[in-house]
Every structure is written in structure tokens, then in C-alpha cells.
A protein has these predicted regions:
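Polytopic alpha-helical membrane-helix bundles and their juxtamembrane interface segments
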Residues: 1-29, 47, 78-80, 88-212
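Transmembrane helix boundary and interhelical junction motifs in multipass membrane proteins
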Residues: 34, 38, 146-149
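Membrane-water interface of transmembrane alpha-helices
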Residues: 63-80, 189
Length: 212
């Protein structure tokens, strides 16, 4: 018997919202369990976005799942001595390359969606998709910059997109994500300062800045 996603949608969105909030709240605390819960959440959002016609966002959830497994491993073993990964900041070169990549990828993905799908918001969908991937990559590396990218590049634009698509609960979720991301930004910056006060600078990976 075929499974009708439209029948399950009233249950999928609340479940995705709850697990999504749990994921970000645990990420703020740098809890490793945030990754498996996040994988479950992204799988639920994948189903939800397919039904809503947000195709780039659907692909994004699949990438999130792959990055989730990578982030899970990297947080455990990506530290300077193969141990827990510390919070750091990206180098200036990394920031410039990411910014250029975001612009080029947004134009390419937006054009692709405009030509090949029935998406009514191809370029906004593409921009939030590319920025989401960027933020998630930064998160897997425990770069502090992941939080402002989530807030200004992803969550704020998504509020408008999801309201336009009739996903009110998911739009409201972005407000919760923004509040949690601000908390994460503050907490991770504090974690960096505490680490620098305790450990020698030699313990910081080469090419990585440490903010006070």
C-alpha cells in the first residue's frame, strides 16, 4: 500500500518542529546527541518540503543528513589531538572563499530551479539553501561564524518563505531558532574565551583565529 504523505503531514510538521528545537538547543550546549536528533529532524523536514514544493530545501535536508553524520564524527574526533573538537573561528581566507562560493552557487542554483522546476521562489529558495549548507558546514567544524549565518542568512529569510508557502508552524519555528542561535553565539564565544584562558595557544589548530 502506498503511503500518502498528505495524510501524515499534520503529524510530520509538529514532530519536525519539536526535534528541530531540541537539535538547536542541544547544539548550543555542544552536546553530541544533537547530531542524531538532528538527522531525524531533517528527515521529517525533507518529507514536509517535498509536499510543499520546496525542492531545493528538500535536497538540502538530504545534504543535512550526510553532514549530520560527518559532524557527529568530527565533533568527537576532530580536535587537535584527535579528541573533542573545540570552538574556533574561521580564517579570513576561509571567510572570503565561502562568501564568493555563496554568491556563485546561489546564482547557479536559482537559475536551475527557475528553469527546471515549478518553484515560485527559485532565487530566495536557492539563497537560503546555499546559506544553510554553508552554515551547516561551519557548524560541523564548530566555527563561531555558523551562528550569525544561521540567523541572518537562513532563519530570517525563511520566515517570509514559509509564510508564503503556508507553513505557519515552520515559520514560527524560525523565531525560536533565532533566539536559540543568539544564545548559541554567546555561549560558544564564552567557551572560546574559557578555553584560551586554560590551554596554551599551541593547542589551537594552525590557521584558526581565537576570539577573546
Amino acid at each position: 500500500m502506498d503511503l500518502d504523505i498528505t495524510v501524515l503531514q499534520p503529524f510530520i510538521e509538529p514532530a519536525a518542529v519539536v526535534t528541530g528545537i531540541a537539535t538547536v538547543a542541544l547544539t548550543v550546549r555542544q552536546a553530541i546527541v544533537s547530531w542524531p536528533i538532528g538527522i531525524v529532524s531533517t528527515a521529517l523536514f525533507l518529507l514536509l518540503f517535498l509536499e510543499a514544493g520546496l525542492y531545493a530545501d528538500s535536497v538540502l535536508q538530504g545534504l543535512y543528513i550526510l553532514l549530520g553524520f560527518y559532524g557527529w564524527w568530527h565533533w568527537l574526533h576532530g580536535g587537535p589531538r584527535g579528541n573533542d573538537l573545540p570552538v574556533t573561528t574561521a580564517s579570513p581566507r576561509t571567510r572570503v572563499l565561502l562568501a564568493l562560493g555563496v554568491v556563485l552557487a546561489t546564482l547557479a542554483v536559482g537559475r536551475f530551479l527557475d528553469v527546471t522546476t515549478d518553484s515560485t521562489v527559485p532565487y530566495p529558495d536557492a539563497a537560503t539553501t546555499v546559506l544553510s549548507i554553508t552554515a551547516q558546514i561551519l557548524l560541523t567544524r564548530k566555527y563561531l561564524e555558523s551562528w550569525p549565518v544561521w540567523i541572518f542568512g537562513v532563519n530570517l529569510p525563511y520566515i517570509a518563505i514559509y509564510l508564503y508557502k503556508g507553513l505557519a508552524m515552520t515559520a514560527a519555528l524560525q523565531l525560536v531558532f533565532i533566539a536559540l542561535s543568539i544564545a548559541g553565539w554567546v555561549a560558544w564565544r564564552r567557551s572560546m574565551a574559557e578555553r584560551r584562558a586554560v590551554l596554551p595557544s599551541a593547542d589551537t589548530p594552525a590557521g584558526v583565529e581565537v576570539a577573546a
